[in-house]
Regions:
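Extracytoplasmic/lumenal domain signature
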Residues: 1-269
Length: 269
């Protein structure tokens, strides 16, 4: 957990019984408004911590509390970073208030940056499309972006929507065709669904009465073989029941990629 008060610029790690993990909290001297991402970078069997801060930095803190590296961007990082294992490399990715999306190597070097048209508050997510890793993120400019591991636009992307993208993009095979659909929400109260080529799925967008305020969560709630899409608005929780068979297994289908909320995802290529 990252601290955001003037006197609490620390990262906290807490055991299940409420006690501090040995060596924590660690004073990093930077305010952290969003969550962290976890992955064992030094292969010692203990997760390390990636965080973004209001000091414009994306940083890696090792499990012993040592700051391993820090990369300076052009403005505040107010989205939780994500760690994407492509099978060939580890990427650390996050959006910034300087309108740019950054992906770094596991050593903290810049792999690429991508300039959008507004602030990026959504955490990135990833999926395998056509045998390659695809990285998705949204911006306050209303666009959903999809890039490859070198920062190039994927065919059919970006897609402009009618409102700012307010949560991370999620993926599931909602129509049982063997390929993932791209699910998102925006500040115009729209639930959106796209194919991998950027074409919109039938019956979407579905418009709610109030703006959406978070990331979709997709799973088969009632065990009937089709999927439900859970979305939160500024007023209510909405559940959309898909009427064809589908699966969310193996996809980034929930906030931070998994039920442990680690922000880590391994793409099978």
């Amino acid at each position: 957990i990252g601290g955001y008060s003037s006197s609490g610029k620390k990262i906290y790690a807490i055991n299940a019984d409420g006690t501090n993990v040995s060596g924590f909290p660690v004073d990093v001297g930077e305010k952290i408004i969003k969550g962290v991402a976890l992955y064992d970078f030094n292969n010692n069997g203990i997760d390390d911590i990636v965080f973004g801060s209001d000091s414009d930095n994306i940083s890696l803190l090792l499990d012993d509390g040592t700051l391993h590296w820090s990369y300076s961007t052009g403005d505040k990082i107010q989205s939780a970073p994500s760690i994407i294992n492509t099978g060939n490399e580890i990427l650390v990715c996050a959006g910034s208030k300087d309108y740019s999306f950054y992906c770094l190597t596991e050593d903290g070097d810049l792999k690429f940056s991508y300039l959008s048209e507004n602030n990026i508050y959504t955490s990135p997510s990833a999926v395998e499309l056509n045998g390659s890793t695809a990285i998705f993120f949204g911006s306050d400019d209303g666009n959903i972006y999809a890039v490859d591991v070198n920062g190039n636009n994927l065919p059919g992307w970006p897609q402009q929507t009618d409102g700012n993208i307010v949560g991370s993009i999620a993926f599931s095979d909602i129509d049982n065709d063997g390929t993932p659909e791209i699910i998102s929400t925006n500040g115009a109260g729209q639930l959106l669904s796209y194919n991998g080529d950027g074409s919109q799925n039938q019956y979407f967008p579905i418009t709610a009465e109030f703006p959406y305020a978070g990331s979709p969560h997709i799973f088969d709630l009632d065990g009937d073989g089709d999927l439900e899409i859970f979305t939160g608005s500024t007023n209510t929780l909405i559940v959309t029941d898909m009427k064809s068979a589908g699966t969310s297994d193996g996809y980034w289908s929930t906030y931070r990629g998994n039920d442990k909320r680690t922000g880590y995802y391994e793409v099978s290529e």
